From Swiss-Prot:
Name of the featured protein: Small ribosomal subunit protein uS2
GO cellular component entries: cytosolic small ribosomal subunit
NCBIfam families named in the record: rpsB_bact
PROSITE patterns: RIBOSOMAL_S2_1
Keyword Membrane: no
Family assignment from sequence similarity: Belongs to the universal ribosomal protein uS2 family.
Pfam families per record: Ribosomal_S2
Keyword field contains ATP-binding: no
UniProt keyword list: Ribonucleoprotein, Ribosomal protein
Biological source species: Streptococcus pyogenes serotype M6 (strain ATCC BAA-946 / MGAS10394)
């Protein structure tokens, strides 16, 4: 049983890597072939590694882990926010602020300021302040919410971090590694996998691919918290979705 089937991965375009000239040689073992200048990710490995990631995240959630979803590229922002929220976890889906983890005390002060501004509005303080001052406070709140709203209620530094595109999120990954926080990530063919604890080889530029993987890890959290099996497993159709079929799909899409 696989938590994500080969068919689902194919339909979401998870197999499409980057142009061969943009590859990172460290990802060679996760690449099946090359077609028309594009690397094709070995989805048989993706299926297995997605299972490992699912189990790891599920078990962490069962032990009340705090899990942070990170994906600031436009293709990932919506899925990261939606799925982290659905799983009752936390997210950063705009620019990563340097020191978010390694300088957590300072970040907490900014979060406290965000909560203070919200409280001022709720208590009616805005009603007695000059309009210009209220406008400045609203501008400050909007900026704080944009960058910190997803971790506003995060009780502590996360126990696990899930990353979409560690090539883009290098600062976040380095901070996690410095603090010994395990990193699960969607890793495309252009990224360095060395600092990733659990690699999910995948196209991190397609919205459908990001949504599929991210939603599955949210399912893992929900299952872990509920302590029961969710209906998330699928039988892989090894005949209809063999590795040879992947090549045919790629050739067809790139014809």
């Amino acid at each position: 049983m696989a938590v994500i089937s080969m068919k689902q991965l194919l339909e979401a375009g998870v197999h499409f890597g980057h142009q061969t000239r943009r590859w990172n040689p460290k990802m060679a073992k996760y690449i099946f072939t090359e077609r028309n200048g594009i690397h094709v990710i070995d989805l048989q490995q993706t299926v297995k590694l997605a299972d490992q990631a699912y189990e790891f995240v599920r078990d962490a959630a069962a032990n009340d882990a705090v899990i942070l979803f990170v994906g600031t590229k436009k293709q990932a922002a919506e899925a990261v926010a939606d799925e982290a929220t659905r799983a009752g976890q936390y997210f950063i889906n705009h620019r990563w602020l340097g020191g978010t983890l390694t300088n957590w005390g300072t970040i907490q002060k900014r979060i406290a300021r965000l909560k203070e501004i919200k409280r001022m509005e709720e208590e009616g303080t805005f009603d007695v302040l000059p309009k210009k001052e209220v406008a400045l406070l609203n501008k400050q709140r909007a900026r704080l919410e944009k960058f910190l709203g997803g971790i506003e209620d995060m009780p502590r530094i996360p126990d696990v971090m899930y990353v979409v595109d560690p090539h883009k999120e290098q600062i976040a990954v380095k901070e996690a590694k410095k603090l010994g926080i395990p990193v699960v990530a969607m890793v495309d063919t252009n990224a360095d996998p060395d600092d990733i604890d659990i690699i999910i080889p995948a196209n991190d530029d397609a919205i459908r691919a990001v949504k599929l993987i991210t939603a599955k890890l949210a399912d893992a959290i929900i299952e872990g918290r509920q302590g029961e099996d969710a209906d998330v497993a699928f039988e892989a159709d090894t005949q209809a979705d063999s590795i040879e079929d992947i090549v045919e799909v790629v050739e067809g899409d790139n014809a």
